[in-house]
Amino acid sequence: MAPAWSLLLALLLLSCNAICSLGCHLPHSHSLAKRRVLTLLRQLRRVSPSSCLQDRNDFAFPQEALGGSQLQKAQAISVLHEVTQHTFQLSSTEGSAAVWDESLLDKLRTALDQQLTDLQACLRQEEGLPGAPLLKEDSSLAVRKYFHRLTLYLQEKRHSPCAWEVVRAQVMRAFSSSTNLQERFRRKD
């Protein structure tokens, strides 16, 4: 009987390693929600990107904040939280509801809200570890400034459909990069 329990325990530990990320225990639903968010962001597209070429802009995407090799786990979780929170805020504006399908936005906000809950719990867990490094605000600040530039751009373009398409593409890029960051830390664990 003991070998059977040992095998079950080993399988449980292996499966936990496969679904946990960043050293904290995010539920399997978190990775499913991340994929769901990217799918929903794709589905929100209402305008052909080629018709909005004149609206493209360089928002100085903070690639280093999302892909830096010096980022510690707690810092990475903080950056992931920032990206998710700002994506949630953008999807909750009146302008987004005017341009995008409300039922898709509701689904997107639900998925983002679940991720925020998971990340907040994970951040508390990582910050509570003895010897955890103090968070450097540089990466989180870079993400906040990036999303601020997106918000200013929307205001400047008067929340036009093309402006929202450009922002949607930028948010997808940020979210994809945050997913890649999460995967990188999961592989290290």
Curated annotation (Swiss-Prot):
Family annotation (PROSITE patterns): INTERFERON_A_B_D
Q: State what this protein does.
A: Produced by macrophages, IFN-alpha have antiviral activities. Interferon stimulates the production of two enzymes: a protein kinase and an oligoadenylate synthetase.
This protein's species is: Bos taurus (Bovine)
Could you tell me which PANTHER family the record lists for this protein? Answer: INTERFERON ALPHA-5, TYPE I INTERFERON
Name recorded for this polypeptide: Interferon alpha-D
Q: Could you tell me which cysteines form disulfide bridges?
A: 24-122, 52-162
Q: Which InterPro entries match?
A: 4_helix_cytokine-like_core, Interferon_alpha/beta/delta
Q: Point out the signal peptide segment.
A: 1-23
Alphabetically sorted, this entry's keywords are:
Antiviral defense, Cytokine, Disulfide bond, Secreted, Signal
Instruction: Extract one GO BP annotation from the record.
Output: natural killer cell activation involved in immune response
Q: State the Gene Ontology terms under molecular function.
A: cytokine activity; type I interferon receptor binding
